[in-house]
Amino acid sequence: LTPWYEVKKAEIQQSNQKIYTRGKIYGFTFPYVYTQNANEKTGTFNVSNDSVYLFNNKDRSSPVKVTVSGECKNPYWEVFKDGELVASDGFFLNLEEGQTLVVSSLFQERTALLYDSQGNISSVYQQQDHTKTNFVHMPIGNSSIVFHTANAEVSVEVYEECDVF
């Protein structure tokens, strides 16, 4: 049997202003958040995943569809639960204005697709950062997903599941 889904959707629309800074930009991150509160970071979604499973254990999680639209370089996102990094995904690509990256971790359609303004669709799986967990899922309970996408617009859909039948 396939599970029933209830979709929770949230969006962040950010201004497309370019920010010019000085100083060194490091090409690595650490698996923790530097702020006292993860909600202080721009591009953070707080998610309450109320999925129900017949065998409800901590390893179960729900699929997610992430959409990133607009200009950004090497977009990536991280899922935190109780302050700990539990999943991450990212791509080595430069999104231009008019392009949209759609990444789905649904079992039936695990895809990473790039849409351009002319309607062309291409797979960007080969540009996925394979040092990350990839095709993130949201854990049961309260968690946060943090996007590092500069000024691009972001939306996330969490597919709550019910497979108790």
Language model: regions and residue ranges:
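Short, charged, solvent-exposed linker or helix-capping segments at domain edges/interfaces
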Residues: 8-19
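Oligomerization/assembly interface segments of phage tail-like spikes and tubes
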Residues: 1-9, 143
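Intrinsically disordered, low-complexity segments enriched in serine, threonine, and glycine
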Residues: 17-165
